[in-house]
């Protein structure tokens, strides 16, 4: 158990002794007794002792009231300090909540960026890498050059065949003309002897 404070001891004693009710009545009785004792001129020791006893009780009651007042002041100061501490704790809690909200928003952005990055990485992984793509492009370029060279060769051969075919057609035409001319000459030569024999 913790140590008992002075305030707690005083509070318990005050609860045992009472809350000071009837002090005004006790003071009034003391004043009346004192006035009566003064006016009577009596020197009775018992009456004097009773007044001293009442005075002591009044002094004790006043001291008790002062103690209660001081204790209340200390409690008020303590409550004020607790209130300030609570206000500071609430303000710190609000700042912490605001900071946590910022951290949550940042975490959400990071998570979103990571998800977008993962999705983009999956798309990239579905395509060949740069080195492989360059190799394929080089192979296609090489094949295209070979096809272009083959096309040029075929076109050259086709042009050569076209020229040769043209020469062949010209030769055939000339040969045909020559044959026709030979046929005409042969016919003319056959007709000439017959004309000579008829006269």
Curated annotation (Swiss-Prot):
Recorded coiled-coil stretches: 73-192
CC per GO annotation: cytoplasm; nuclear speck; nucleus; THO complex part of transcription export complex
GO BP: any one term: mRNA processing
Highest taxon above the source species: Eukaryota
Tagged with keyword RNA-binding: yes
UniProt xrefs under Pfam families: THOC7
InterPro entries: THOC7/Mft1
Example of a GO MF term: RNA binding
Compartments where found: Cytoplasm; Nucleus; Nucleus speckle
Keywords from the UniProt entry: Coiled coil, Cytoplasm, mRNA processing, mRNA splicing, mRNA transport, Nucleus, RNA-binding, Transport
Assembly, per entry: Component of the THO subcomplex, which is composed of thoc1, thoc2, thoc3, thoc5, thoc6 and thoc7. Component of the transcription/export (TREX) complex at least composed of alyref/thoc4, ddx39b, sarnp/cip29, chtop and the THO subcomplex.
Family: Belongs to the THOC7 family.
PANTHER family the record matches: MAINTENANCE OF KILLER 16 MAK16 PROTEIN-RELATED, THO COMPLEX SUBUNIT 7 HOMOLOG
Annotated function: Component of the THO subcomplex of the TREX complex which is thought to couple mRNA transcription, processing and nuclear export, and which specifically associates with spliced mRNA and not with unspliced pre-mRNA. Required for efficient export of polyadenylated RNA. Plays a key structural role in the oligomerization of the THO-DDX39B complex.
Name listed for the protein in its UniProt record: THO complex subunit 7 homolog
The encoding gene: thoc7
């Amino acid at each position: 158990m913790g140590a008992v404070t002075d305030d707690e001891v005083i509070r318990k004693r005050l609860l045992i002794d009472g809350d000071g009710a009837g002090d005004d009545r006790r003071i009034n009785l003391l004043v009346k007794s004192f006035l009566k004792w003064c006016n009577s001129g009596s020197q009775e020791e018992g009456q004097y002792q009773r007044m001293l006893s009442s005075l002591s009780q009044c002094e004790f009651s006043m001291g008790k009231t002062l103690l209660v007042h001081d204790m209340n002041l200390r409690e008020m100061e303590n409550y004020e300090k607790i209130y300030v501490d609570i206000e500071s704790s609430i303000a710190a809690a609000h700042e912490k909540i605001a900071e946590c909200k910022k951290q949550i928003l940042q975490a959400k952005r990071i998570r979103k960026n990571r998800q977008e990055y993962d999705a983009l990485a999956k798309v990239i992984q579905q395509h060949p890498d740069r080195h492989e793509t360059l190799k394929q492009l080089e192979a296609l370029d090489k094949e295209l050059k070979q096809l272009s060279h083959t096309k040029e060769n075929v076109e050259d051969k086709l042009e050569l065949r076209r020229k040769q075919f043209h020469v062949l057609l010209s030769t055939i035409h000339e040969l045909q003309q020559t044959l026709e001319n030979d046929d005409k000459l042969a016919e003319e030569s056959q007709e000439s002897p017959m004309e000579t024999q008829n006269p």
